[in-house]
Regions:
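Helicase-associated low-complexity/disordered flanking segments
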Residues: 1-48, 255-284
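Conserved P-loop/Walker A NTP-binding site and adjacent catalytic elements of P-loop NTPases
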Residues: 21-24, 29-205, 212, 230-235, ...
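Conserved C-terminal RecA-like helicase domain
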Residues: 79, 87, 94-103, 238-313, ...
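Conserved two-lobed SF2 helicase motor
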Residues: 114-130, 285-296, 305-325
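Conserved interdomain hinge at the start of the Helicase C-terminal
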Residues: 212-236, 243-246, 300-308
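Non-catalytic terminal extensions of ATP-dependent helicases
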Residues: 288, 307-308, 391-798
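Conserved segment of the helicase C-terminal RecA-like domain
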Residues: 330-333, 337-339, 345-386
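Compact beta-sheet-dominated globular domain cores
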Residues: 802-837
Length: 837
């Protein structure tokens, strides 16, 4: 029986409340006083702002709100900041209300979009609000994690529904809202409904606070002895979190029995990367690492071990928050300051409470603990003073250690102030874009009046409003000049006095806003060109968000190589530094793409909201015949391999879906198959999550996670595996061309081809030929011979060298072990010979 079956015949507030309370009681749940207060207001039709601590049951309030909306025959929307949380809530609400009554919209996927309960990202609802305004079929909006309203890049999406959906009842929820008096008055004025603020300073699990002057290892030992684990140690960089985990390996945290349980739960889990092998050591010792730069499968393993109560300590970053499912008893701050991208500053009250609020597990703990460490130099000074005892002379002789230069200090008073401070008021992040104007112009009615109202009656200060008005006028003029909109002499049948001259439906994609530009740019490429497949990749890569860490690493690598070359050429220091300013990461087709983008933007001005960014990550990887591990190693990206994988997965999805089938050459299909299989073998969870979001009726979130943990044999995808083998062989050709015998030796020492053996073979080749080709012809299929021996689980391969004379009588012979390849998730190539045929 679902909650739908409990709906009373009429939406009487008392009947609604009693029905919901009865349903909760049947599940052994007793409503907290603040939940009762919120639900009474919701069923009466009021807007409700719920500002209660983490773990206080806001999900129950949301379910009650949806229940009330359904009773009134209204469509109710639940919004969350990230797709994973939207998906999680979708399945949760399916269990409560039945799958036929719940839908999901994420930009990537649309499932049961006509359902009366819709789970979506904030941007999706904002898009609906802009497109349909007061005529939108939205009766109620439940906004979870409403503090995202103040996020610099995304906050506008939390404001637009409030401005444009006066017909809706709003339920705004967060643990860190601060002063909400502005929203209380604003919602009432706009919707005509009373607005109730439900606060509760009382946590289901109360918190205790402590400031420590002891070294961190001593603090941690005390916490473990006091049975206050699991402890989440908060760091403000990913590097610090990993370094801490390594440093804590000297502390014995788990008994032999606990270590056996950890090993049993890990089972056959595959730690495929350098960081993964380190993580394996940490977790077997009872120490987890958790940050956004990790592969999803590693984060999921840490969460799984933590949920089983097997990790004593988790070293993580301050990003712990939305969508992170890690049970914690104690939060230990290593600092109360952070670098925000511009400067080092003290934590804001909202940031502090967002992290501290994770301490204490409802249903498990009777108390949570929040501990902050004094700065290291203060700890050392306290230790020296304690050693001096009460002797005044000894205390005067203590040489106090100074803070590092430029250090931003914090103290016990800082800690106490943060504890007692309310989160800062939420700041408006309204913005004007081409998409906003086009959406408003497309809706029925007077677009000028609608835009004037939105621009003059938003949450911005007047000075900012004037700036937005000027921006809107400039955008409108560009649309008019470009022929995208036209003014009408008389209003049309739906009251428009300005209308669009183009159909926006095919041009608007929340997840890939530049995909239509890519389709136009494909037409500029020559299908007969040897570089056609890679040029298609470059077009798609230019439309993707920049992976900043990868691009910075590419630039650093390029500059390092340039400096070495200039030094070898005797270039003076000043000139070297001057030349370096012009060296950046690779940007294939830059001139062609920017020229095409400028032309395309004249007739599609809304793409101006999304700048083009040529780059070469996939192309660079493919041209160098690199595996994922080699890419991470080459650019020293071990700490951000999760970000690398996320970019590769996004590129695969874009290539797979953006490029029309009739434009996919055989080489491009090979490349796409290789990329998809590589992503799956490293960590399939990103692609599985994508497939699950697109087809939730086929696969639940839990099944998607189970699927992600089950690695398919790499040889099962024959096309992709053939490309993996080709790349593995050609990687050796590239290194041979550069005479990198040390790297070749590292790759092939186990099969008897160390650096000396490679050096001897290549000396013979270069005695005969001046050069070894690595261009498109060199990596063509004609120069790779594969003889399959399935009965022996073996392939015999021969990579022929592309010599300058075209003799093609030298090459590399190797065996590919299919069984070992499936075990490792990559092509296991064993060189057997390098020489003449």
């Amino acid at each position: 029986m679902t909650l739908i079956d409990q709906l009373p015949r009429t939406p009487d507030p008392d009947a609604l409340y009693e029905a919901f309370e009865s349903w909760a009681g049947e599940r052994g749940l007793t409503l907290y006083p603040h939940q009762e207060e919120a639900l009474i207001e919701v069923v009466s039709g009021a807007n409700v702002i719920v500002s209660t601590p983490t773990g206080s049951g806001k999900s129950m309030i949301a379910a009650g709100a949806h229940f009330a909306a359904l009773a009134r025959d209204e469509v109710t929307f639940y919004t969350a900041p990230i797709k994973a949380l939207v998906s999680e809530k979708f399945f949760e609400l399916c269990k409560i209300f039945g799958t036929e009554n719940v839908g999901m919209l994420t930009g990537d996927a649309s499932v049961n979009a006509d359902a009366p309960v819709i789970c979506c990202t904030a941007e999706v609802l904002a898009s609906i609000a802009l497109r349909d305004g007061k005529d939108a079929d939205v009766g109620q909006v439940v906004m979870d994690e409403f503090h995202f309203y103040a996020e610099g890049d995304r906050g506008w999406a939390w404001q637009i529904p409030i401005l444009e959906l006066p017909q809706a009842q709003f339920v705004l929820m967060s643990a860190t809202l601060g002063d909400v008096s502005f929203f209380e008055k604003d919602l009432t004025r706009r919707t005509g409904r009373p607005t109730a603020v439900v606060r509760s300073a009382t946590r289901p699990v109360p918190l205790s606070y402590e400031y420590r002057y002891t070294p961190l290892t001593e603090t941690l030992t005390d916490l473990l002895e006091a049975r206050q684990a699991p402890v989440y140690i908060v760091h403000f960089t990913q590097a610090q979190a990993v370094e801490r985990a390594q440093a804590l390996m000297s502390i014995n945290m788990c008994s032999r029995s606990e270590k056996e349980q950890i090993a049993e739960l890990i089972g056959n889990f595959r730690f495929t990367t350098k960081f993964g092998r380190n993580l394996s050591r940490y977790v077997r010792h009872g120490i987890g690492v958790h940050h956004a730069g990790m592969l999803p499968k590693y984060r999921r393993l840490v969460e799984k071990l933590a949920q089983a109560g097997l990790l004593k300590v988790i070293c993580g970053t301050d990003t712990l928050g939305v969508g992170v499912n890690v049970p914690i008893r104690t939060v230990l701050f290593t600092a109360l300051t952070k670098y925000d991208g511009t400067r080092v500053r003290t934590l804001r009250a909202r940031e502090f409470h967002q992290i501290a609020g994770r301490a204490g597990r409802a249903g498990f703990d009777t108390e949570g603990f929040v501990v902050a460490q004094a700065p290291e130099h203060v700890v050392e000074n306290e230790k020296a003073l304690a050693k001096a005892g009460d002797d005044p002379k000894k205390r005067r002789k203590v040489v106090r250690k100074k803070a590092p230069e430029g250090f931003v200090a914090w103290s016990e008073q800082t800690f106490e102030k943060l504890i007692g401070s309310e989160p800062e008021p939420l700041a408006s992040r309204f913005r004007v874009t081409h998409t906003m104007l086009l959406s408003v112009i497309a809706r029925p009615g007077n677009a000028f009046e609608a835009m004037r109202r939105m621009l003059e009656d938003n949450h911005e200060p007047r000075k900012q409003q004037l700036r937005h008005i000027r921006r809107a006028i400039a955008i409108y003029r560009s649309l008019l000049d470009g022929g995208i909109v036209e003014k009408l002499d008389t209003p049309d049948a739906e009251g428009r006095i300005v209308r669009l001259t183009v159909d926006l439906q095919q041009d608007f994609a929340l997840n890939q806003p530049l995909s239509t530009f890519a389709l136009a740019a494909f037409e500029l490429l020559d299908p007969e060109s040897p570089s056609y497949a890679l040029d298609m990749v470059s077009v798609v890569e230019s439309t993707l968000d920049d992976p900043r860490q990868i691009l910075a690493a590419q630039q650093n690598k390029a500059r390092g190589e340039a400096v070495a070359a200039m030094k070898a050429d005797g270039v003076e220091y000043e000139e070297r530094m001057e030349r370096l300013q012009d060296i950046t990461y690779p940007k294939p087709l830059e001139e062609l793409l920017f020229h095409a983008y400028d032309t395309y933007r004249k007739s599609h001005p809304w793409v101006g909201d999304h700048p083009l960014s040529p780059k070469s990550v996939i192309r660079d990887m493919y041209e160098r015949a690199m595996s994922f591990t080699e890419l991470v190693s080459h650019y020293e990206l071990a700490r951000t391999e999760g970000i690398v994988l996320r970019y590769l997965a996004s590129a695969f999805k874009a290539l797979d879906h953006t490029v029309p089938d009739d434009l996919k050459s055989e080489d491009l299909e090979d490349l796409i198959a290789w990329l998809g299989e590589m992503v799956r073998q490293v960590d399939s969870s990103l692609l599985d999550e994508w497939e699950q979001l697109a087809n939730p009726e086929v696969m639940t979130a839990e099944e998607a996670q189970e699927k992600a943990d089950e690695v398919k044999p790499v040889t099962a995808n024959a096309r992709a595996f053939r490309v993996l083998v080709r790349n593995a062989m050609f990687r050796r050709v590239e290194l041979a061309a550069l005479d990198q015998v040390e790297q070749l030796g590292e790759m092939d020492a186990e099969s008897g081809w160390d650096a000396d053996a490679w050096g001897e073979a290549l000396d013979k080749y270069f005695d005969e030929y001046e050069d070894l080709g690595t261009g498109p012809d060199a990596r063509g299929p004609k120069l790779l011979l594969i003889e399959e021996e399935p009965e022996n689980a073996l392939w015999r391969v021969r990579q022929i060298f592309h010599d300058p004379n075209g003799d093609h009588d030298w090459g590399i012979s190797a065996e590919v072990d299919l069984t070992a390849s499936d075990t490792e998730g990559r092509a296991i190539v064993r060189v057997t010979d390098v020489g003449q045929l």
